[in-house]
A protein has these predicted regions:
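Secretory/organelle targeting and membrane-embedding segments
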Residues: 1-172, 176-512
Length: 512
């Protein structure tokens, strides 16, 4: 196993450190839905970037499955174009030439038995030609309605069978159902064919460096964890804001909405990592156990009308351009009640967090694209300074910036230079891009590599998915019975009702 040395090596890394990077063993990846946007913009470039970093085995194989009437060479050209346009690392001909050796394409529809037999033959051929050892991951980059038929076809044609020390794995993209009942049905279908340790549910947020850094920040340092509790924390705000509209996703988005699309998975996972107890170790079972405890302890306020807000973007100005509202978007029903903004207040019934509200919000066409977790601390119980000295002093906060500008900011009060005592907020800032010269890998690079390695640390388990739906389902049911979403102009930070929700608690949203 050759040691791979990254170009632009990290100056903070000890040159005497002889730990090898984790490199996948003999294996291949089959992508269903290989002609879609996700495959072209994320999956294919991530595979190339892993190969470019020396983290894939020499005989790695990539198989595309779709309806297109393509030869292997046509598929290779599509991958080539996607890599050239979207890859994070520079294009190198020698890496490409090695990767192309293991590329194959299988033409067919999901209900085509002959196509799945051809897929089985292709995998057997690659085992001989590329030495993949029977180890294949099946990536279902397909609409949820197609999951059951693809899973059943894999079973019917013995593609899910693990023999002679080889492995087979299923990779599933969100949404994992649209409510608890459908999630349970989907899980039953998947687990009829694949055991739980063979199933990898992709939440790409968990592949981001800054999300993993939540655990490092909390548990590798002694200065944060002692104050990470109800005795010191006033409240927590978790925000995922987008400045774009729905684009061409009307067919997917309408009827799903912001809460199902983002809160059920991304934001509740961020809440779990922020609030969980320290795991016994950093292995998948220990992490999942602590996340499940937190999600199981989440409680909804009794009055959902006052503790939740949904909104829909109206026409407005975004980045200096006039943009249309959600109901004017192509393909959207003019009477649609789908939420493009959602804000909820949650509490966690355990000793660490009792009485501390967690405010989650997400939305499209907001002020800017940003994802952050803000842990906001209580004010000092006593201040020796007079009120004029501290009138501009806010609350201390630790803000974890997930995207963009990945990093951490600590906000605290400091004396303003001068003859009088005046205290204002200042910030201490850590930015990934400045402290580490190696650029962070894309989330899909990390996640695909983990699938090939069989490392399920960063993948939500069945229980986490179902617990998340148990939290969201009552909110969705309440919204279904009570009127329409509040309107908010594009380019703003959401409906005024969301500001009023926090104002009733004597708080206000952070302006990221």
């Amino acid at each position: 196993m050759a040691r791979h040395t990254a170009t632009g090596a990290n100056p903070l890394r000890d040159p005497a450190d002889r730990r090898l990077p984790r490199i996948a063993g003999p294996s291949g990846l089959v992508i269903f839905g290989v002609t879609g946007d996700l495959s072209r913009k994320k999956l294919m470039p991530a595979v190339y970037d892993l190969a470019n970093r020396g983290l894939l085995p020499p005989g790695f194989s990539l198989v595309g499955f779709a309806r297109r009437d393509w030869e292997h060479e046509d598929f290779a050209q599509v991958v080539h174009d996607a890599v050239k346009e979207h890859a994070r690392t520079p294009f190198r001909e020698e890496v490409w030439q090695q990767l192309i050796q293991g590329m194959r394409f299988v033409q067919g529809t999901f209900d085509d038995d002959d196509a799945f037999e051809r897929l089985r033959g292709t995998i057997e051929e690659l085992d001989k030609a590329q030495g993949t050892g029977g180890n294949f991951a099946f990536y279902l980059s397909v609409p949820p309605k197609s999951f059951p038929v693809v899973i059943q076809q894999l079973k019917k044609h013995r593609l899910a069978d693990q023999t002679d020390g080889s492995w087979r794995r299923a990779v599933i993209e969100k949404p994992f159902g649209h409510d608890l009942k459908s999630a349970e049905e989907l899980n039953a279908i998947v687990h009829e064919v694949f055991a739980s340790e063979q199933v990898f549910r992709i939440d790409h947020y968990l592949g981001k460096e800054t999300v993993q850094n939540i655990l490092a920040l909390r548990f590798a340092n002694t200065m944060f964890e002692p104050i990470w509790n109800r005795s010191f924390v006033d409240h927590v705000q978790i925000t995922m804001a987008e400045d774009i509209g729905i684009g061409g996703r009307a067919g997917y988005y309408d009827g799903i909405g912001a809460a199902r699309d983002v809160i059920q998975n991304h934001l509740l996972q961020l809440l779990a990592l922020t609030a969980m107890e320290e795991p016994a170790s950093f292995d998948a079972d220990a992490l999942a156990a602590e996340k499940e405890k937190v999600l199981g302890a989440v409680r909804l306020p009794k009055d959902l009308g006052r503790a939740t807000v949904r909104g829909q973007y109206a026409a407005g100005w975004q980045g200096g351009e006039k943009v249309i509202g959600y109901l004017e978007e192509e393909g959207i029903d003019k009477k649609s009640k789908t939420d493009t903004y959602a804000a909820v207040k949650l509490e966690i019934d355990n000793r660490r967090w009792a009485g501390v509200p967690f405010y989650l919000r997400t939305g499209k066409r907001l002020g800017r694209r940003v994802t952050e977790i803000a842990v906001v601390f209580q004010r000092a119980p006593h201040s020796p300074f007079d009120t004029t000295a501290t009138e501009e002093l806010g609350q201390n906060a630790i803000v974890i910036r997930v995207q963009p500008d990945e990093g951490v900011t600590v906000r605290f009060g400091s004396k303003v230079p001068g003859t009088s005592m005046e205290i204002r907020d200042v910030s201490m800032d850590f930015a990934y891009g400045e402290s580490f010269t190696e650029s962070s890998p894309e989330a899909y690079e990390r996640l695909i590599l983990d699938v090939l390695l069989g490392d399920s640390n960063l993948f939500p388990r069945t229980e986490e998915v179902e617990l998340s739906w148990k939290i969201l389902d009552p909110i969705e049911a309440h919204w279904d019975k009570h009127g329409k979403p509040a309107q908010y102009p594009s380019g703003t930070w959401g409906p005024v009702e969301a500001d009023e929700m926090l104002a009733r608690d004597g708080r206000s949203w952070r302006r990221p």
